[in-house]
Every structure is written in structure tokens, then in C-alpha cells.
Amino acid sequence: MAERKASVERDTLETQIKASINLDGTGKARFNIGVPFLEHMLDQIARHGLIDLDIECKGDLHIDDHHTVEDVGITLGQAFAQAIGDKKGIRRYGHAYVPLDEALSRVVIDFSGRPGLQMHVPYTRATVGGFDVDLFQEFFQGFVNHALVSLHIDNLRGTNTHHQIETVFKAFGRALRMAVELDERMAGQMPSTKGVL
């Protein structure tokens, strides 16, 4: 089996990012981004998706976190698109429900080749530890646009904003793990009647 790894660099006037992933990893993670709450959530993707992630970013944090959070999502999406290759033999679809105390979220993903995001998270607070939670919409939109996936995110219940977000990222990691998993019964075939994704 060919290694499903990728390394991507993205340089703009706002951010300089290096991201490496291994879809068949063990959940190892290393981050140097400068946004602790984002790093905490990315760790959930690695751990629950069993995807090795290594991301470094120098961003214009003196302005705010917006460019950094969005551009990390973009770069991670680019890395996924590279690592997954032609998509032959993958399950393609993934889904997960994840609870954390009072919070429950559902994430469903399709590596369809068509970007689309439906995100419904009724945050109970605007910030967590000074982090603007609205920025996660920008993160996921950046990911979706560059990984070329259809992504549905629903927080079904929750009163603690940290818990709401953490269940989203844990479910996202688990849905990714399911979708990119190689299906032996597919025998390397394209998971689409069109023959292309």
C-alpha cells in the first residue's frame, strides 16, 4: 500500500504555514500555531482520527486570530486532498456522534469532490478563554473548500461552549477516520458510480 502522507506549505502576507499529515498514523500531534484553543481542538482530530498531524504557523496574531485559524483550515484541507490521492478504495463517507457530559454533536462527511459546509452550532457563549468561537466556521469552510468535501456539522445539545466545540472536533476526527479508511471489499475501486470523484 502506498503511503498516504502529505506535506504542504502555504505562504501569504498574513500567514506562513507548514502542515504534514499521515492518514494511516497513530494520532501523534505536534503544533506550533500560537492559538492554544485551536491547537487543543486539532489534537482532538489527530487523536480521534488516528491521523498524525504536524502544523507550524506564523500568523498576524497581533491583529487577531482570524487569518491564522482560517489559513490553518485551508492548509489542512490541501494536505488531506494530497494525501488521499485519487480516492480509490476509500470508504468515502464517514459519520460520528460524540458526547461530552451534557453536549452532543454529529458530524457527517463525504469525500465527494464537491465542497459544501452545513454547520449548525448554537454556541452558548461568544468566546472560550478569549478565543472567538465564530472562527471555527472559517476553519471548517477553509478545510471544506480545499479538501473538496461535503461536511455537515450539528451540535445537537449542550450548554458549555467548550464542550460543544470539543464534541464537534472529536466527531470530526472520527468521521474523517471512517471516510478515509481503506475498504478491502472495494479492492481499489472508485467509490462512485461515476468512476471519478
Swiss-Prot record:
Its EC number is 4.2.1.19. Pathway: Amino-acid biosynthesis; L-histidine biosynthesis; L-histidine from 5-phospho-alpha-D-ribose 1-diphosphate: step 6/9. Its main location: cytoplasm. One of its GO terms (cellular component) is cytoplasm. It holds the Pfam family IGPD. It is found in: Cytoplasm. Keywords: Amino-acid biosynthesis, Cytoplasm, Histidine biosynthesis, Lyase. One of its GO terms (biological process) is L-histidine biosynthetic process. It catalyses: D-erythro-1-(imidazol-4-yl)glycerol 3-phosphate = 3-(imidazol-4-yl)-2-oxopropyl phosphate + H2O. One of its GO terms (molecular function) is imidazoleglycerol-phosphate dehydratase activity. HAMAP family: HisB (MF_00076). Belongs to the imidazoleglycerol-phosphate dehydratase family. NCBIfam families: PRK00951.1-1, PRK00951.1-5, PRK00951.2-1, PRK00951.2-4. This is Imidazoleglycerol-phosphate dehydratase.
